[in-house]
């Protein structure tokens, strides 16, 4: 197979990375995609760094066995814990990670706090701390750990009273005029954006790193002359460690959602 026609591998602790892959599909519809969701071991955000590193290397190995031409670690927690180690081990393949879209958030120039919703591990790791050092002096940045949110989404709960109550509890300390921008620092979270807008004002920007990551993926593929040149819609393959048809169905539903 021509190297350009080989698939792009995406990996996440569960279904969250599909929010990033959707952006990549919009940007490069003729590419072939393989998605590996590790729902059996979700959520990653409450595990130890060593556990997350082991799971990340396992996922990368399984994608390499599928002959992928690039890998997107579409998981903020795995990026925080393992991306540097993964890149140093696999030097011959583009490996793209994801970070909270803090740089983008600062460009909105709105009064109020920049609130970053993320898993506890993402907020503790050095990658996030270096982002805070870069932007923390000039902007009011608030970390909001949301440990349980991934579990809602992994169970297909994207709306409803229980989720709304959880989000209300998280935001109870902030009035709408206290909030400048909300940054979704976990790839699962874009799927509950509409429910979040029932809790905060609709004029508050909610942003994530999905598009920026997909643009970086395209740039890296172009740089390596790996962009697919075929003029037809590419294929999408979904694999989940959970092994259940239910997770595959949920994944398909999330890809097809607007």
Swiss-Prot record:
Gene Ontology annotations of biological process type: cell wall organization; peptidoglycan biosynthetic process; regulation of cell shape
Keywords: Cell shape, Cell wall biogenesis/degradation, Isomerase, Peptidoglycan synthesis
Pathway the protein acts in: Cell wall biogenesis; peptidoglycan biosynthesis
Transmembrane segments: none
Top-level taxonomic group: Bacteria
Pfam family, one: Asp_Glu_race
InterPro entries, per the entry: Asp/Glu/hydantoin_racemase (IPR015942), Asp/Glu_race (IPR001920), Asp/Glu_racemase_AS_1 (IPR018187), Asp/Glu_racemase_AS_2 (IPR033134), Glu_race (IPR004391)
Reaction catalyzed: L-glutamate = D-glutamate
Binding site for substrate: 12-13, 44-45, 76-77, 187-188
Active site: 75, 186
Single GO term (MF): glutamate racemase activity
Keyword check for Transmembrane: no
EC code(s) of this entry: 5.1.1.3
Function: Provides the (R)-glutamate required for cell wall biosynthesis.
NCBIfam families linked: glut_race
UniProt record similarity statement: Belongs to the aspartate/glutamate racemases family.
Name of protein: Glutamate racemase
Species of origin: Clostridium botulinum (strain Alaska E43 / Type E3)
């Amino acid at each position: 197979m021509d190297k350009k026609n080989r698939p792009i591998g995406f990996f996440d602790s569960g279904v969250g990375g599909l929010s990033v892959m959707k952006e990549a599909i919009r940007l490069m519809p003729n590419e072939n995609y393989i998605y590996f969701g590790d729902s059996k071991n979700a959520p990653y955000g409450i595990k130890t760094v060593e556990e997350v590193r082991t799971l990340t290397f396992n996922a990368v190995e399984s994608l390499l066995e599928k002959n992928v031409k690039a890998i997107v670690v579409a998981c903020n927690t795995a990026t925080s814990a393992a991306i540097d180690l993964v890149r140093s081990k696999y030097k011959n393949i583009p490996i793209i990670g994801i970070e909270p879209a803090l740089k983008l958030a600062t460009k909105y120039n709105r009064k109020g706090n920049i609130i970053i919703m993320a898993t506890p591990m993402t907020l503790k790791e050095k990658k996030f701390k270096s982002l805070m050092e870069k932007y923390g002096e000039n902007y009011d940045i608030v970390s909001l750990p949301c440990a349980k949110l991934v579990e809602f989404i992994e169970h297909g709960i994207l709306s409803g009273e229980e989720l709304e109550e959880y989000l209300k509890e998280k935001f109870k300390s902030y009035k709408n005029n206290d909030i400048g921008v909300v940054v979704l620092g976990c790839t699962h979270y874009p799927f509950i954006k509409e429910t979040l807008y029932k809790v905060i004002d609709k004029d508050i920007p909610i942003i994530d790193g999905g598009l920026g990551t997909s643009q970086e993926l395209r740039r890296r593929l172009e740089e390596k002359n790996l962009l697919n040149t075929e003029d037809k819609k590419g294929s999408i393959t979904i694999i989940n460690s959970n092994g259940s048809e239910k997770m595959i169905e949920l994944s398909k539903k999330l890809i097809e959602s607007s």
